[in-house]
Amino acid sequence: MKLYDLMTDNRRENILVGSKKPVFGWRVETEKRNVRQESYRVQVWDEQGNSVWDSGTVESSRMAGIQYEGKELQSGKRMTWHVSCTFSSDEGAMTAEEESSFETAYYNRKDWKGRFIGETTDYEYHLYRKKFSCKKAVKLAKLYVCGMGAFECWINGERVSDHVMEPGWTDFRKTCFYTAYDVTEYFAEGENLENIILVKLGDCMFNVPGGRYVYFQRSYGKAKFLCQLELVYEDDSREYVVTDESWKRAKSPIEFCCIYGGEDFDGRRWTKEYLNSDTSEIWEAAVCVEPPLGELKPAPMEPLKIKEIYQPVSVREVETGVWQYDLGKNFSGWARIFLKTDGRKAGQKVVLKTAEKLDENGRIDQSVTGKDYAWTYILNEEREQEFAPDFTYTGFRYVEMTWAVPEKEITLQGEFIYPDIDQAGDFFCSNTLFNQIHEIVLQAIKSNTKSYFTDCPHREKLGWLEQTHLIGPSIMYNLDVHNLYTKIEGDMADSQRENGLIPDICPEYVTGFDKWHKGFLDSPEWGSACVLAPWYAYKRYGDLALLEKYFPVMKKYVEYLSSKTHHEVLHHGLGDWLDIGPCTPHSQNTPVPVVATCIYYYDLQIMAKIAQLLGKKEVAEAYQKKMKLVFEEYNLQFLDDQTGRYANGSQAAQAMSLIVGLVPEEYQDKVVSQLKDDVVKRGYAITAGDVGHPFLIAALMKYGMSDVLNEMTNITNKPGYGYQVVNGATTLTEEWDGPEPGNIHGSQNHLMLGSIEEWFYGSLGGMELVRDGLPFEEIRIQPHPEKSVDWVNAWTMHPYGKINVKWKKENEKTRVFCQIPPGLTAHLESPDGKEIMIVGSGYYEYEI
């Protein structure tokens, strides 16, 4: 038995902890059955070995969310923590212990000893350099950088990390992230050796120029950065190298940089000769500038990285000097080129343009994703050169490269960028179509996971909030997004208005959409993410601290919604956006008040549960009283008690009413029957839109209609997932018929319709983890074998470890195998809900 994956604030050791009350967690590795933690003891020491907290022996089974309760943590310190646990099992008592460490952040602005330096002219870019010598042998070196909008950094010619587009996107008026690195390895042994720090700046979302395609123009100021290198010498003395007027700057190779328009890069200013020169013609004194408005905080989420590389599946010359590369899949990121020249091509340009699709002539089509998006590289004299953009990305599959030299002298690869987060699950089954659907949904999720969940990786790149809760359960099956959800809740808190409103987009980079429809600013289905997203994070990760920290934000928003009701019903918002019908994209099948009030009631229900968890009994009772009023008025206005239809009986109206708990018990059967009849009579076609779709899936699962979902997911005509697969989609598209042959339309890379993962994992795989209603340390294993599936293998990660369910049909029976991690209790149930047995950790095999 051993402990592993020791976490501080949900990340492994050597992370930068921004909280003064971090939370700890761990997992247990053992082959023994029914292992359960009986007690733990957490101890924390500072750099000098002084104890700052000792929890003492705590009798608890809890292995996640253990909050620090010791002395106040100090800035910029390396802390060590140790956990020792006792366990019970079928084979008796056991013990295990392990140690980890973490770094505390700079908690105060005064901890930064330097000043911001940066650009003095809009959309002009420089390289920044500092030369210095170490007075003594270096024992430890830590580098802290806040770069607005984004930066890359080198020490002595070595890139200090493989992170990209750091430090992340926020409302820069409120919050500016910084990052930290252990850079000890970049300093050679010995004293008085010259060292060089080099920083490259770009704009990203901080400063968005025009000039090419741009979805919006907005500026939080000119590019700037703050840097602090902390050197700890062998004798424990310290020295700091910080940004000030002593730094030098030179014209950057970046000539144009726009998150929406692309990047132009002059390789002649990215050579050893240029970078190492000391002439005043190239290098001039840096300029100190005003700091950004936002509070400096360590980035709480994992950094972006190049996570996958795609090689071209085909290359063809589409016209003289223009080469088209097909990378086989739609994804988000950039292309990297490798050139070999005779050394006499300096000044020549290579232009790269991208697209998700081809037009009728077989050429790239940027009509949806942003016309004229491009990367341009100007060659230098070196014989071997390499280029990829630094501070922009897009969604694409095809690249057209314009260069007069034969293709054999240049190679190209696609680089898929998303956060450096753990894969949290996967799903496989005997049904090839289902596997393909899972693949395109997962590809869209990864493509749109950046500093927040984007709607698409090209046209808008905005944080439309509804996605965070509508497909939150589906995302959480696949990726560990715990820290990203923490960051996004911070975005919502930063964007909240005085009256409590949470705008639809956070960070709120774009304003003015409400001139077309007020719902683009204020829609309950979007703003309610501030309540529902952290609740799902609590259900999935057990993060009570997140609920406690942001409870005032949630409360203020729900009060705002209450102020907008008329007879307890809400009447504003976008409703069931992009539902199926002739009047898309606006809600046409379901009245807006039905959709908005369902979400409002769901908010009240969740807030009552959160208040109870936080010990706010009177607040919980107030929400429960409000729920009763909304329940009565909603059913008075919308329920036809003769037919069991809500409003016009749409799929969204029926499903949402069921899932949020607005259906009186005596009418449940009628409401369920109406829902099933509507789906079946339409040939298992979907009519629900962005908002209603996940509730439709959840309702069919909850009320014993997994077989209906099986039929819906197997069809290959529109609207449906299968239609996208058979028509060549490699990522989930914005509209159900997006890849229509001869009329490919809309974004070909959207994640908002990806809720089918809930059925794949939760019903076929039998692992319902968010909507199950069970306590955090209990799970239900209830697979539903369907006629189109012969076997399933699905797994997902719980904070305590891996849950794996496999099943295979054998004659008239289905044999189930499951793996339960230590610390969990599993209810093994048949498809009809009969309990087979209750088990602890271990491997189990049984028949259903």
Where are the regions that the model predicts?
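Extracellular/oxidizing-compartment recognition motifs
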Residues: 1-459, 466-467, 483-486, 499, ...
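Alpha-helical support elements that line or immediately flank enzyme active sites
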Residues: 141, 155, 334-344, 349-354, ...
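Active-site acid/base region of carbohydrate-active enzymes
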Residues: 150, 242-251, 398, 409-440, ...
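Active/binding-pocket-proximal capping segment
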Residues: 151, 160-162, 492, 509-510, ...
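C-terminal capping/lid segments that line or modulate ligand- or cofactor-binding pockets
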Residues: 197, 265-266, 271, 460, ...
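Non-catalytic C-terminal accessory modules of carbohydrate-active enzymes
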Residues: 217, 226-228, 241-274, 298-303, ...
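Charged, long alpha-helical assembly modules
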Residues: 508-512, 518-542
